[in-house]
Amino acid sequence: MTEMLKGIAASDGVAVAKAYLLVQPDLSFETVTVEDTSAEEARLDAALAASQDELSVIREKAVESLGEEAAAVFDAHLMVLADPEMTGQIKETIRAKQVNAEAALTEVTDMFIAIFEGMEDNPYMQERAADIRDVTKRVLANLLGKKLPNPATINEESIVVAHDLTPSDTAQLNKKYVKAFVTNIGGRTSHSAIMARTLEIAAVLGTNNITELVKDGDILAVSGITGEVVINPTEEQIAEFKAAGEAYAKQKAEWALLKDAQTVTADGKHFELAANIGTPKDVEGVNDNGAEAVGLYRTEFLYMDSQDFPTEDDQYEAYKAVLEGMNGKPVVVRTMDIGGDKELPYFDLPKEMNPFLGYRALRISISETGNQMFRTQLRALLRASVHGKLRIMFPMVALLTEFRTAKGILEEEKAKLVAEGVAVADDIEVGIMIEIPAAAMLADQFAKEVDFFSIGTNDLIQYTMAADRMNEQVSYLYQPYNPSILRLINNVIKAAHAEGKWAGMCGEMAGDQTAVPLLVGMGLDEFSMSATSVLRTRSLMKKLDTAKMEEYANRALTECSTMEEVLELSKEYVNVD
């Protein structure tokens, strides 16, 4: 029987293939009284070690297929496994209650999950609850001798169907065989959606009940462009979906022809299309997709991939590799953004109720605790500056005094290197990320002292709307097109231009095809996105008329009071298919 569902279009693409139902094993168990608690602790240690080995392998595969940024979610999982407080409590429960490891594990992790989930105003802690739940499932499976589903074993063209896909599930998808996936829950900003876009696999999320309607082997037709899913489609529907897939493939082939083209609008105005990276390995993808710059190099992955603080020489080699790999094209390097959801096992940070609003990023760098680490990074960057066109960017800046302090440290290290006879480029631009509303509101003052702005919309939207984009209960508040967000962005761009400076954007919004026309109208100079979005965005920009987009942006800023009104207005101005 044919049935149609509508979900959230999370990753572009069209596919028709057999359904592969990702079924979770039965992890139920009985609580058993044990006499030999030492043996039970040994069982727990073995399960923890096996889980750690599995996650390490999955992380390595994720780095290869998805890049360092997407793979970083597994660092949080590995940290849960290594958390001495939690593992210590599990062992204490085994000894005190003389119960089997399964019962102790579940009792302790359920307690942690309940505590973290109870912090409803703290999205960071709620994300930790999700990490603990995912890791607990893996450890429990190892204790019970059960195998978790392994999507890596799929060896024929399939569409994966699941209630939800964990990051470890998504990281194991082989896009040679997995043509799409569909889930009951999730949205465009979930980890699985972001990974799907990186892998270029079609995805439709949030269908509510796809797992109740589909059996293994059913034929599915999926459009990650429209969000439509058809179960056991008719021959006519299959033909329609295949035609849509061919049209999309043809469109992608046309985009590929733009690799070496200039990014200019229909009326000849140039905009810079850049790409975001996490490691030197990512530069190949930047060049393959015709990006004109690296608009965001997230250097924290250098720290997260090390067992200790990376040395000045190690960092120098990494920065040099990126600058040389870009062959003179600009590279914006963000200084370390540690803290929040990025912890280092070798760097003790204080436990905080809300780390996203606490001691992180530049706040650590300019503090006494992080000062030497910051100076080491700046020296490495300054030494590497002679190998390309370096731009340095400070993250999480709220106050002008923070920028002045950071720039002062940079100047001190530059003077030391010059005194040592080390060559340093004399044309390094220094800017800040605009991700805190306070900085966006005071952009006119910052613009007098910085060389550029890069707007980090992911955090700017969260902080402005007071809504975690990963929290489904408040995800409706994560509104890139809300007029309040658009006005903040416009304020930053205009402030930069008033001082003869440039403004870029490195959040997801920069590559959002709905947002690009608005941002062109506002005069954003540089758009930095995932490398796989560059060619598509270049194609879109070639069809836009700047004057028309300026009129559209002006009306959106002055006439609209809701996101829905902005999106409705876009229909009058944007028709580039």
UniProtKB/Swiss-Prot annotation:
E.C. numbers: 2.7.3.9
Any one GO CC term of the record: cytoplasm
Principal subcellular localisation of the protein: cytoplasm
Catalytic activity, as annotated: L-histidyl-[protein] + phosphoenolpyruvate = N(pros)-phospho-L-histidyl-[protein] + pyruvate
Taxonomic placement: Bacteria, Bacillati, Bacillota, Bacilli, Lactobacillales
GO terms, biological process: phosphoenolpyruvate-dependent sugar phosphotransferase system
Organism: Streptococcus salivarius
NCBIfam families: PTS_I_fam (TIGR01417)
Catalytic residues (UniProt): 191 (tele-phosphohistidine intermediate), 506 (proton donor)
Protein name according to UniProt: Phosphoenolpyruvate-protein phosphotransferase
Family in the record: Belongs to the PEP-utilizing enzyme family.
Domains as described in the record: The N-terminal domain contains the HPr binding site, the central domain the pyrophosphate/phosphate carrier histidine, and the C-terminal domain the pyruvate binding site.
Subcellular location: Cytoplasm
